[in-house]
Curated annotation (Swiss-Prot):
This is Protein translocase subunit SecA. CDD domains: DEXDc_SecA, SF2_C_secA. PANTHER family: CHLOROPLAST PROTEIN-TRANSPORTING ATPASE, SECA INNER MEMBRANE COMPONENT OF SEC PROTEIN SECRETION SYSTEM. SMART domains: SecA_DEAD (SM00957), SecA_PP_bind (SM00958). It comes from Shewanella sp. (strain W3-18-1). Belongs to the SecA family. The gene is secA. Zn(2+) binds at residues 893, 895, 904-905. One of its GO terms (cellular component) is cytosol. GO terms for biological process: intracellular protein transmembrane transport; protein import; protein targeting; protein transport by the Sec complex.
Length: 909
């Protein structure tokens, strides 16, 4: 009841928002007749006029109605397409830092041209962001004629283009590209050697297509640029041979139950646990193979690396399944996106997991990586001055959009009423019964000539259905991560009479399914088609279209409920576009993942008690509610994980912004002479304080130690003891000043020898190189801190507060080390001429080019759990590192938490 009340309130607020925007729509419509009278040249001149008005002090809101009317009129002339009133509403929502929920087929791509044009008038650049390269290229090329007609330039930013092409793309008025590429360019710009190497302008306005996919589904997966670390492929191969010797047991050991297996899997938490028996077995196997000393423990401090490899191998074998979580193609393990079902070439799991999967599959093992730079989408997109997004399904996640990004969601009405028929779920006892019912439904649809889109949650499931259809001689097309090159073509023709298309999750998103097939694609396939050919293709399509509508339109058939209601709604949304006929139904079984993990055994027991015969389905509101509640639980858990990830990443983000801002200032500055002077006083002063404590008596001074340190670290040979012996009036303060002055004099002598301009350039190069090296080490230290921070909860401390405190200490340490190392290098290195600085810069670039950078959109593996384990969910459970006697799985944990060892530090990550 309370939920319904909230929905009602949200709906009324939505109506009020639309009512306010409707007034502007009336203004735009009133301008239409006048704009139709303008010549092409007069219409094009509007762009220059708007820019002049903005320069004179008018705002975007002041010119919005006229700008939208201009785009609408230009679209009529260039595309022969007129923006509907609902598209004008959508455009206004997108201009006002909000998310527009627009149903599939309502013309989101054309809607985006309105705010893109308006915001491009500022000259600061507009980024239109899509989920893949194909959509970015398609939308850019489709809309290019419209924008160029209005005098704007269009750029495309996708993977694989050169630096100059990227610069040109970013300097365009409107840049289309993928979320990953924009994020990686931001990181690359902050690793650049000079201002000329940067490609991005300041982040002004981002318009995100499929915003739910990018800001929610991918929010847990940070973008990481990493370089190869040491080679440990042989160790992965050896450890991999141990795992097949281990036996799984159904449930975890407890006081009441001790199994015969070596490990157990917690499917709900996606974790795997060694049993006490399994732990001993692994240690014995390692000893047999000479990888562990006799009597040594896997959990001793010296064996941390070995434990890491064993954990990774066990997870690879038990939690990651081929053709579900990844595929093997051309000798490489390629991750499959759990949300879209698409493959993600070039991306790798972190923490050694990818190498463990490669060892499992017997393919070439690539080196582990060291993080060079990383950022989450949450923190990247929050840097934009203006942010907006559009999708067909945002309403279910409206709270998260508002809470995390400050974006309100506005549901834009459809241009025509929705007539799709959404039928109740059918639940079967077994998966086999479910698949038989699905095949029967498909056959019935084909007899009527009704096209069917079958949505699956994994590649494995899509291939199983494909095999069943081959057996039943049902012609079909398979669209999954293995064949996404043909994705758009298959989806576009999925609406033909009697067509059967199997699609993994939301593969093909962004391409409309037109009833009767896509006649435009047929025309595009011909070389220079004649008007007669075009007319015939369109006439044939009209016949097919009418036949499909008569058969009931596109039928959506879901083979399993997804964890998120939103993704189920996306599948349903493929039918019923622009008022078309259509229908949808989900087929479920008690063996489905969601039902097995989250629906209780009572549901299955009740179904059996009802005396259901084989092949019989249950269709009841109570069951539907139970499924929806299970989905809500998972959604809430995933939201908590994303929220906690953000809270932790915010700490790192504050530091990242400070470092990147400092780095950019260094690169842009003509000279950093003043900076060097300031830090020189700090560094030399801090070293003196260690040997001559402030306001201390001379007996406490360590003068020989100070002389040695100044000579070793700063090439400063000073007779300090001799000064003190000869000069009775030389006190602590004057001595300090003399030492600092001595360093300054030595540095000035160096400057006179090589020339001021050469030294200034050298200072900048040293500062940047030192900062980059320390930042890389700092990222590794922060990762290490985050992985173990949950343990503070056992000491009655707040892990989040402890993380903030310790990360600040690490950052302070970074800044102090930076100052010290820069002054030390500048003191020691002898620069002879300009060529030395140039050689240093060239060597640095050469070394960087050798680094095989890996661009990951790697899942945040350490971030698991949620729900009741609020703080523990921040990091994977790290096994206790222990020396001495072995702790039993059911013994009290040595950390003092009061919990059993297996439930505390005995958990595997």
């Amino acid at each position: 009841m309370f939920g319904k009340l909230l929905t009602k309130v949200f709906g009324s607020r939505n109506d009020r928002t639309l009512k306010g925007l409707q007034k502007v729509v009336i203004k735009i419509n009133a301008l239409e007749a006048d704009y139709e009278k303008l010549t092409d040249e007069e219409l094009k001149a509007k762009t220059a006029e708007f820019r002049e008005r903005l320069a004179a002090g008018e705002t975007l809101d002041d010119i919005m109605a006229e700008a939208f009317a201009t785009v609408r009129e230009a679209s009529k002339r260039v595309f022969e397409m007129r923006h509907f009133d609902v598209q004008l509403l959508g455009g206004m929502v997108l201009d006002s830092n909000r998310i527009a929920e627009m149903r599939t087929g309502e013309g989101k791509t054309l809607t985006a041209t309105l705010p893109a044009y308006l915001n491009a008038l500022t000259g600061k650049g507009v980024h239109v962001i899509t989920v893949n390269d194909y959509l970015a290229r398609r939308d850019a090329e489709n809309n290019r004629p419209l924008f160029e007609f209005l005098g704007l330039t269009v750029g495309i930013n996708v993977a694989g283009i050169g630096q100059q092409e990227k610069k040109a793309a970013y300097n365009a008025d409107i840049t289309y590209g993928t979320n990953n590429e924009f994020g990686f360019d931001y990181l690359r710009d902050n690793m650049a050697f000079s201002p000329q190497d940067r490609v991005q302008r300041p982040l002004h306005y981002a318009l995100i297509d499929e915003v739910d996919s990018i800001l929610i589904d991918e929010a847990r997966t940070p973008l990481i640029i990493s370089g190869a670390a040491e080679d440990s492929s042989e160790l992965y191969t050896k450890i991999n041979t141990l795992i097949p010797n281990l036996i799984r047991q159904d449930k975890e050991d407890s006081e009441e139950y001790v199994g015969e297996g070596d490990y157990s899997i917690d499917e709900k938490a996606k974790q795997v646990h060694f049993t006490e028996r399994g732990q001993e077995k692994v240690e014995n196997l390692l000893i047999e193979r000479g990888m562990l000393a006799e009597g040594d423990s896997l959990y001793s401090a010296a064996n941390i690396s070995l434990l890491h490899h064993v954990n990774a191998a066990l997870r690879a074998h038990t939690l990651f399944e081929r053709d579900v979580d990844y595929i093997v193609q051309d000798g490489e393990v390629i991750i499959v996106d759990e949300h879209t079902g698409r493959t993600m070439p070039g991306r790798r799991w972190s923490e050694g997991l990818h190498q463990a999967v490669e060892a499992k599959e017997g393919v070439h093992i690539q080196n582990e990586n060291q993080t060079l730079a990383s950022i989450t989408f949450q923190n990247y997109f929050r840097q934009y001055e203006k942010l907006a997004g559009m999708t067909g399904t945002a309403d279910t996640e409206a709270f998260e959009f508002q809470h995390i990004y400050g974006l309100d969601t506005v549901v834009v009405p459809t241009n025509r009423p929705m007539v799709r028929k959404d039928m109740a779920d059918l639940v079967y006892l077994t998966a086999n019964e479910k698949y038989q019912a699905i095949i029967k439904d498909i056959k019935d649809c084909r007899e009527r000539g009704q096209p069917v889109l079958v949505g699956t949650v994994s590649i494995e499931q899509s291939e199983l259905l494909a095999r069943l259809m081959v057996q039943e001689k049902i012609p079909h097309q398979v669209l999954n991560a293995k064949f996404h090159e043909k994705e758009a073509e298959i989806v576009a023709q999925a609406g033909r009479t009697g067509a059967v298309t199997i699609a993994t999750n939301m593969a093909g998103r962004g391409t409309d399914i037109v009833l009767g097939g896509n006649w435009n694609m047929e025309i595009d396939a011909l070389d220079n088609p004649t008007p007669e050919q075009k007319a015939k293709i369109k006439a044939d399509w009209q016949v097919r279209h009418d036949a499909v509508v008569a058969a009931g339109g596109l039928h959506i058939l879901g083979t399993e409920r997804h964890e998120s209601r939103r993704i189920d709604n996306q599948l349903r949304g493929r039918a019923g576009r622009q008022g078309d006929a259509g229908s949808s139904r989900f087929y479920l079984s008690m063996e489905d993942s969601l039902m097995r993990i989250f629906a209780s055994d009572r549901v299955s027991g009740m179904m059996k008690k009802l005396g259901m015969e084989e092949g019989e389905a249950i269709e009841h509101p109570w069951v539907s509610r139970a499924i929806e509640n299970a989905q809500r639980k998972v959604e809430a858990r995933n939201f908590d994980i994303r929220k906690q990830l953000l809270e932790f990443d915010d700490v790192a983000n504050d530091q990242r912004q400070v470092v990147y801002a400092q780095r950019n200032e260094l690169m842009d500055a003509e000279s950093i002479e003043d900076t060097i002077k300031n830090i020189q006083d700090d560094v030399i002063g801090a070293v003196i304080d260690q040997y001559i404590p402030p306001q201390s008596v001379e007996e406490l001074w360590d003068v020989p130690g100070l002389e040695q340190r100044l000579n070793q670290e700063f090439m400063l040979k000073l007779p300090i003891q001799e000064w003190l012996d000869k000069e009775d009036d030389l006190h602590e303060e004057s001595l300090r000043e003399r030492i600092i002055t001595s360093w300054s004099d030595a540095y000035k002598a160096k400057e006179e020898m090589v020339g001021a301009s050469v030294l200034r350039q050298f200072e900048k190069a040293v500062m940047l190189q030192t900062l980059d090296g320390l930042w890389k080490e700092h990222l590794a230290a922060m990762d290490h801190l985050r992985q173990g921070i949950h343990l503070r909860g056992y000491a009655q401390k707040n892990p989040k507060q402890e993380y903030k405190r310790e990360s600040f200490e690490l950052f302070q340490q970074l800044l102090n080390t930076l100052k010290h190392d820069v002054i030390s290098v500048l003191s020691k290195v002898q620069v002879q001429a300009q060529s030395d600085v140039e050689e240093m810069e060239a060597r640095r670039r050469e070394e960087d080019a050798k680094i095989q950078r890996d661009y990951q959109h790697a899942a945040a593996e350490a971030l698991v759990g949620g729900g009741d384990e609020d703080d523990e969910s921040i990091a994977a459970h790290t096994p206790m590192i222990r020396d001495g006697d072995k702790v039993g799985r059911n013994d009290p944990c040595p950390c003092g938490s009061g919990r059993k060892y297996k439930q505390c530090h005995g958990k595997l990550s």
